[in-house]
Structure formats: structure tokens, C-alpha cells
């Protein structure tokens, strides 16, 4: 079996092919399904569609009017989209262009929120976005009094690249990728944790409001996860990839109660890390493909997997994506992860005292012939709080990497809105 790795689409094909090559219990019929209540209009990754490709959502709760809460979502080169709770678009913001036509354009990858950032003397909610194309963060103020255009760019003009030394390095695109925000309850300082594309590095960036009403940031420290792993049989395993690429992280979420970062290393598993990037990371679960050797063929740009030595996990099929938390006031809840290779979502106990043990899994299946489920899901966001009459028990928003029905041969993606109460009932 030969697997091409030259593009994101090809990487998804790798996951699918590997999934079908193993006897995976998660592909059996025993996993329960929930169904979406709404979906966004499809996004198309072509010139006519503005090269828009759905990736990662965040849910902003309007505390004054929860029924008018918003979903803020990245569309890669298509910029940022803002939706109401009926999944209708209320605002579209473009990704910034590159410095010149020869440079990479802006490409928004992940988004997360910070509540109550002090800006211009007032507490303000902001959306923080990783701009992979320009290797920067973009920060947007959220204004509940502007329903037709609630987001305003407040990124400081002097904001520096996150990982790159110059524009040439930016164009190599080992740039800002995954993102999660965190506010330290002890100090009140707010941060973004940002992963580096095609590398194992995670950076901790402190958000810095300025006197001009903009937001800058500074790097506090970085942490490098392993790229190779010692197996129980004494062998050393490195996930197969194109030459020069390392197993990257994208999906990340921070538990606000104790400052724990959960980071999904796509071809490896889920790490538990102190959000301050101190201490030793703990791998709490592995993908099924963990330990499977692969040989990369430069002529075909393909990877041939070898025999499975049996050291992988039993719940996740690579890529692991879309980490999000379902939080309860008493500390209970779930860590959810998108098991992209078999189109399931895996739930772990939120509590570290329980060692984040596996709890259950579910799928998001089609609700009708016109409202499909979620496949090859990238980003996900959950909010366990009442959101008006539409979602009185909270909301789960997930990316759909294969939006159907599409438009002929055009690649279509979008977002599905799911009643979080139904998800919790399924997990319990």
C-alpha cells in the first residue's frame, strides 16, 4: 500500500488508508451517533470561492443576550467568518495579504477567545487567530453592540513573526499553526499557546494591550515535544513524513481551572502539559498507528506503512485533531478529540485525578438528505452554557471536512452545529 503525503488532502488519504488496513474496533457499529441541528453555507477552496476552507471554530457567549451569541471560525486563505446560532453568516473578514505578490498570503488556521482583556481602560473580549501565512497572531475585538460587524482588527502594527526570523523563513511556512488561549488566574495575564507547522515546537506568547488600543504579544518560552519514540521492543519509531518534516501539533485546548494544556500531536497522540510550558509532558493516549514503521519514497512522494507492532492506542485514529473541553462547574466534564481517521469523536475524563481516562466515543451523523454529518473533522469547540432557546444546554461546533452535497468537483467544507446536551446524554 502506497500513501502520498504531498498535501493536506493526501495526508487525509493516508489516515483513511491506514484505518482500513487495520481491524479497528471504532469502525464497528457500536458507536452512538448524534445529529446536527444546523450547518453553515459551504465554503469552497478555489478562486471562485475565495480559497476558503473551513478549519477551526470558537463560540463566543453574549452574556447580555445568550441567544445572540456568535460562532467565530477560520476559513484559511478565506479569512475569518462570523455566524449566528442559526449558522447564518453575519460577518466575513479577509486574511491580510503578504508583503508582496511573491510572498505567502495570510492564511487563518486556528482561533480561540480571551474574555475580559483590559483594552483602552475597559474589559473586552477578543478573538485570537493564528495566521499561518504571515506567521503572526491576529487579534479581533468583539463588540456585542455591532451585530452586523461585531469583530474589529486590533492587532498591533508592529507585531513580530511568531517563529520566523525573516520573510524568507515565513515563505517556508514553518509558521504559526495550532492555537489555544489561556488566562492565568493567579496573575490575570493572558496568553496564546501556538504550535509550529511541521515542527514539534509550542510557543507561549503573552498578549500585551497597548496604549493605542491595539494588542501586541511577546514570546515567554517554547517547548519541543519528541519527534522520535522508544518502543517497548527497544526500537526507535519516527512517524513517516516528507524529508525535513516533524510530527506537528494542531488541536490544543487549555483547562482554565488548573492551567493544563492538552495538545494533539497529529500522528502521535494527546499530550498533557502545564500551560506555562514547564514540567514534563505526559502522553495520555496514542493513535492506533503509533509505532507503525513507514518508508518514504521521494520519487512517488508516498509513504509505505510496514507491519503494525501493536504498540498503538485503541481509541484514536490519526490524525488526532479538534481538542475541546466540556466543562462542569464541579470540575467534572470531558476532553473531546476528533479522531479524524475514522470520523469519530473520543471523550476522556476531564479530571487529572482520574488520569484523563477514556470514557466513550460518538459520531456526528447525517440528520437528513440535506444536512449531513461531519467527516475528517479538523477543529471543534464546545460551550456548556445556555445559549437562548436554540441551545439551552450548550453547543458543540465541529468542522466538516467533506461537506455534502457540494457543487460538482469543487472541494467543499463547513461547520456543523450540534446540541451539546445530546452529546452529553450520549456520553453518559
Predicted feature locations:
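Secretory targeting and sorting signals
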Residues: 2-28
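Detector for methionine-enriched segments
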Residues: 1-2, 252
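Sequence/structural signature of beta-propeller domains
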Residues: 29-428
